[in-house]
Amino acid sequence: MGTGLRSQSLRGPRPSYGKLQEPWGRPTEGRLRRALSLRQGREKSRSSDGGPERLDTLGQEWLPGSLGDTEQLIQAEQEGSQRWLRQYQQKIRRRWESFVTSFPNVTLSRSASPQPPLGTTS
């Protein structure tokens, strides 16, 4: 009886599947697309086979439209990452500048930006 309940809970969709997000709270387009395609493949497999027992055919059913589609998805995800990084760096720069300006009697001989840690390039 316990195993029946366990297998039943594994078959049902979990509400957190649709909410894939990065730690900063913004959903990643590429991951959401992948989650949706995997979910559609799983539902397609389930409806045609009558259950999740035939998961071995799932990998064969899902094929990307073409290599160009895959490249477009990768490029879109990279552009999103670059956009986030640029926004993050701007936010850090603004915070640093506001921190430095909070000391009115201090003048800096260098530009008002933090030095990157050793071993990294900027």
From Swiss-Prot:
Pfam families: DUF4633 (PF15464). This is Uncharacterized protein C11orf86 homolog. InterPro entries: DUF4633. PANTHER family: HYPOTHETICAL PROTEIN LOC689065 (PTHR31831), RIKEN CDNA 2010003K11 GENE (PTHR31831:SF1). Residues 1-68 are annotated as: Disordered. Residues 1-10 have a biased composition (Polar residues). Residues 40-56 have a biased composition (Basic and acidic residues).
